[in-house]
Structures are given as C-alpha cells and as structure tokens.
Amino acid sequence: MNTYNLKKMFAVSVASIMCVSALAFSGCGDKKAEVSQTPDETTPATTAVSTADEPTAQNYLESIGIDTATLGINPNIIHDSNPVGFQLDMPKNGDTIAVVHTSYGDITMRLFPEQAPKTVTNFVNLAKAGKYNNSLFSKVTKDFMINGGYCGTSSYGEAFEDEFCDRLFNIRGAVAMSNTGADTNESAFFINQKTAETYKNEGGWEHLANQWDSIKTQLANYKDSNLLTAFIEKNGTNCYDTDSVPDSVKKLYEENGGNAYLDGAYNAVDRGYTVFAQV
C-alpha cells in the first residue's frame, strides 16, 4: 500500500480518535481513548532526577570553543535509573496506559509520567477535556512515522518545554511530541514507525556516525561566525552526537528500528523530540 492511500485510510478511520476515562487496563464500547492507572501494589515508582550539570552531548560544543550559554543552549536532561529498553516492557501495576480506539482497532500506549511528567500531564489533560475527539492522524509516512493530535494549544495554554530522558528513545512504536523547535510542544504527537530492516537498509549506525562527523566539521567552521545560530536552527535535529551514545542504545535501535537522531538526550545543541509513551 502506498503512502498516499495509507494516509487517506487513516484520515477516515480515526475521525473519532480519543478522550479519557479512568479504567483499569480495559476498554469500553465507546470510540475514545482511555487513560487508566492501577494501584501500585508491587513496584515502587521510579524517581527520575534532572541533572543538567552531568556530562552530556552538549559538551562537544564547549570542547571546540563554543559558548553554549550565549546560544541559549541550556539542556536539562532527565537521567533515569531504568535499564535501556525498559520502555518495551509490558505495563505493570501502577503504570498509566492510554487506549486509542479506531475503526481499524485499538492502539494501546504505555505512558511514562516519571520520565516525562509535564508532557504526560498535558496529554492526559487534553484527552480528559475531549480535545482529541474527532481529531485525525493527518499524515502517515511508511517506515517513518504517523502524525496526529493536532487540536490547538497545550493544556497549559502555551507551548511548553522539552523533556529529554536518557532512557526513552524514538524506537519503533515510541510516541513523541511534535514540535517546531526547542520548547515548542503543544498537542500534536507522532508514533515512530521505522522498522529495524529499514533502519539497517538506510545505513544504520554508520550512516548516523558519518552524518555527525559532517556536522562536527561544519560546527567547527561556523563557531566564530555570526551564521552559527542560523546553522543550528536549520540543522539542530541532525546534531545527534553519536560519539556520546552508549553501545546499549545502538543495539536497541539495531534490534527495534526507529529514528535515533530524534533523541534529544544525545543532541549536541539541545534539539529533539520528547518521548512520553510506547505503543
């Protein structure tokens, strides 16, 4: 099925997409999305600690003499104690899930309120308020992503900041916020769809590493130029520092596919897309 037909099919099939009611891991008959949470009886909640002063990908800029503060680059990465890949675990007692009902079946998402608290709160509040009702999956790109949730501003009444966690990744099935730049999250989100096979065929980690080598050269060339800010604005998402990514993360993408360069926790210029759920 080509991309055009798939896009058209989704636009029709999810005309009634989501709202929220509190249930325990089960659906109801309505065409809506539910967010539910069961009492945590066995597993304590994970505490995610934001530690902006720890070494991150942004240190590369400082190593070549770029003052990140003057560029407004102030990363606040959430460092989590869960193992790499935990987002693929099945929901347990105490976890929060959302069920999106469509005429082509349900989409169940496990939400991550500890790792992306403000983003999950925004999603739940919008859904409870019925803001996602009758919204569309407006764009479907085969082996890339499904875009949806365009229903206006955030539940906070304005765009809000990114929440990059070093244990949540844009692997296949990950749900992340759409944005138009740093800290511009509102209501829209996307579901990553790139398969492991496509990821490999596109060059995998070698392709990403070569891209980063090229970006490093350009950053060094622009570092003393008044064009540096413009370069970062245009190429920010591509400033994915593969030198700082652990082998366990590389393996995760090799096995599951996804769009690694969208991860903000390993981006040298604090750009990326907040992951807040997993299908």
PLM segments and residue spans:
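Bacterial N-terminal signal peptides that target proteins for export
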Residues: 2-14
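Core hydrophobic alpha-helical transmembrane segments of single-pass membrane proteins
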Residues: 16-20
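C-terminal motif of bacterial Sec signal peptides marking the signal peptidase cleavage site
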Residues: 21-27
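Cyclophilin-like peptidyl-prolyl cis-trans isomerases
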Residues: 28-279
